[in-house]
Amino acid sequence: MTHLKQALIYSLVIGSVFATTYASSEASDDNTLANNLIVEYATPQTDKEKQIKQEIELSGVNDTVIDLSNQLFMFKQPLVIQYGGDDGPLYDPQTHQVLIPYGFYAESLNYFEKNQYEKEYGKSAQTGAVDTLLHTLLHEAGHAYIEDQKIAILGKEEDAVDNLATILLLNYVEHGADAAISAADMFAFESEDRPEYYDLGEYIDEHSFDLQRYFSTLCLVYGSDPEAYKNLLDEVENDYLKDRKEFCIEHFDVITENWHQYLKDSDEA
């Protein structure tokens, strides 16, 4: 099967702030595109929030999401990404807004620093936090697109938009696999921070468990390029590894093709 491989995004290196940042490679003067997705920032209340706002702006993640949306998932009603406040990350269907607290970025950064991400994985904690933010923005934008387009989801919507965020990174963002792996690692870090047991209510939660989300994301990354990521699933027991690798290759193709029934490449419109 042929996948859309158009590269919309290029990665940069900016001083010592981030190892990898994202930026738009196609600026559009079209007012319709410009108004498709709107980014707003609440006034930072502390010096820490001011720093976070600046780091988010410098990272270019918003431009990446805007480019992907303009190219693949246009909204009937403009979507607003609102940074700041206490709620989120979440998509609010009542206001058609994605809410991202400044504290979410700070929490992600803390996880990557605490787990010595640069020492263990060769990527800075800032890169891990930015990658996680990008995956989260695409995840929440996925909820918004499902609501906006009235897409029927058979199964957990949270799993569906996790998959969407990951295949968008893999198919359209340069070094998107690295970003997806960072986001998966964040799921693993959160899982390690949990008690050894789940509350009964969590078994009927809309989200899969963090460790499931970790392996599901890695599965798609492996399936996108088995040769490049041949060791990515080595945590899986040998008794299951061969079958899981075969499944992940097929799973990536199926998820990509299924989502492209709803994604609209503007070059083909």
Which role does the model predict for each range below?
Residues K156-R194:
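Post-HExxH zinc-binding segment in Zn-dependent metallohydrolases
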Residues Y83-D86, P101-F104, L138, E147-Q149, ...:
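Active-site-proximal beta-strand/loop segments in catalytic clefts of secreted hydrolases
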Residues H135-D148, D162, T166:
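Active-site recognition of the HExxH zinc-binding catalytic motif
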Residues D29-N35, L200-A269:
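Pan-zinc metallopeptidase signature
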Residues S24-I100, F104-N110, E257-A269:
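A metal-dependent hydrolase signature that marks the N-terminal structural subdomain at the beginning
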Residues M1-S25:
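Classical Sec-dependent N-terminal signal peptides that target proteins to the secretory pathway
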Residues E113-H135, I151-A152:
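Short pre-active-site segment immediately N-terminal to the catalytic Zn-binding motif
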Residues Q45-E55, D148-L164:
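Active-site metal-coordination segments of metallo-dependent hydrolases
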